[in-house]
Curated annotation (Swiss-Prot):
Annotated InterPro entries: Orthopox_A49
GO cellular component: host cell cytoplasm; host cell nucleus
Signal sequence range: none
Protein name, as recorded: Protein A49
Protein's organism: Vaccinia virus (strain Copenhagen) (VACV)
GO biological process, one term: symbiont-mediated suppression of host NF-kappaB cascade
Similarity field: Belongs to the poxviridae A49 protein family.
């Protein structure tokens, strides 16, 4: 898929967009169907593992995050932005992103998770902040926010990126 996106071949790009559109719609429906069966502790652990680049794609919300990450990664702006920050700015970014977890806005929560994933690609930050991330996210219950906002967020992502 990535080669098609970057090749400039219009047919390949249109196929990629169609595939990602379908995947995002499908996984959003699966999240709605399965979210109640996922224990909150397991959901939070899987979110932390996703951030730390160890994804459990059997969890539909993690599959949703992975799909969104793939779509957004094509824009490639996030990596460049993170790489342009110094350590203090990254620490400020981590603190600010954590605030998103305490708001009832799924778009902000997903943005925070994906930004933290980009930051944790740096082994130094992963080593330093892995434990803090795990303990902070363990206290959060986002199932209600997911259930309430997943379809709207999915539509917004498709409109914005595809």
């Amino acid at each position: 898929m990535d080669e098609a996106y970057y090749s400039g071949n219009l047919e390949s790009v249109l196929g990629y967009v169609s595939d990602m559109h379908t995947e995002l719609a499908s996984i959003s429906q699966l999240v709605i169907a399965k979210i109640e069966t996922i224990d909150n502790d397991i959901l939070n652990k899987d979110i932390v593992n996703f951030i730390m680049c160890r994804s459990n794609l059997d969890n539909p919300f993690i599959s949703f995050l992975d799909t969104v990450y793939t779509i957004i990664d094509q824009e490639n702006y996030q990596t460049e932005l993170i790489n342009s920050l110094d350590d203090n700015e990254i620490i400020d970014c981590i603190v600010n992103k954590f605030m998103s977890f305490y708001k009832d806005n799924l778009e902000n929560i997903v943005d925070a998770i994906i930004t933290l994933k980009y930051i944790m690609n740096n082994p130094d930050f992963k080593t330093t902040y892995a434990e803090v991330l795990g303990s902070r996210i363990a206290d959060i219950d986002i199932k209600q926010v997911i259930r309430k906002n997943i379809l709207q967020l999915s539509n917004d992502i498709r409109e914005r990126y595809l």
